Design a protein with these regions (language model features):
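Active-site metal-binding loops of divalent metal-dependent hydrolases
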Residues: 116
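Phosphate/pyrophosphate-binding loops at sites that engage ATP/ADP/AMP, CoA/4′-phosphopantetheine
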Residues: 96-109
């Protein structure tokens, strides 16, 4: 089902020269997506959901976003228990990072995502953002996906756009490779101001 939905769209976008990142935890989908024109595989499981993901990405030679993950969304809130969230997330993401490198994923193809909103309560998310320099210090590009997430407040995602822009603006100059947002124009304007 995932492949039926995304592969035809990727093919059409690639024909138009659009840069494409595919969001999947499945190695087979990642392979087909890259063959169809995607250039980045964004794996929210950080390689934990599919044992074939790292070897597949290594063979494909594409960019790979490795996100911190403690399990599927149905039970991730129960797993939001940390002593020191930043140290533990770095430790856990480093384990997956070592596995990716051992499987042959090239260092220059890896992008790290600390997993804002995944197995983290609001305080954890803010702590990660406040200490983002510790992730940047790992020496990999860092992607932050904070857009419209619950920890920003508001009952509806649209009510979180202003806070999304404020967080984006706060990340300027901190060595972040990219932010993943919904309201692109407002975030670009915030970065340029």
């Amino acid at each position: 089902e995932e492949q039926v939905r995304v592969i035809p769209v990727i093919r059409e976008l690639a024909k138009k020269g659009v840069a494409i990142s595919v969001d999947t935890m499945r190695a087979t989908t990642a392979k087909l997506a890259v063959e169809a024109g995607a250039t980045i595989v964004n794996d929210v499981s950080g390689g934990a959901a599919d044992p074939e993901m790292f070897s597949t990405v290594a063979k494909l030679g594409c960019k790979y976003t490795l996100m911190h993950w403690r399990g599927h969304s149905k039970d991730m809130n129960e797993k939001a228990i940390y002593g020191d969230v930043v140290s533990e997330v770095i430790e856990e993401i480093s384990i997956q990072l070592d596995k990716a490198l051992a499987a042959g994923v090239k260092r220059e193809n890896i992008i790290l995502d600390p997993g804002i909103g995944f197995a983290k309560n609001p305080e954890h998310n803010w702590e990660v953002l406040n200490r983002i320099d510790e992730f940047v210090a790992l020496g990999y590009p860092v992607l932050i996906g904070h857009s419209r997430k619950r920890f920003l407040g508001g009952d509806h995602p649209d009510e979180r756009e202003e806070a999304t822009v404020a967080v984006t603006q706060s990340l300027v100059g901190k060595g972040i490779w990219a932010v993943r947002v919904h309201g692109v124009k407002a975030n670009v304007e915030a970065i340029r101001s």
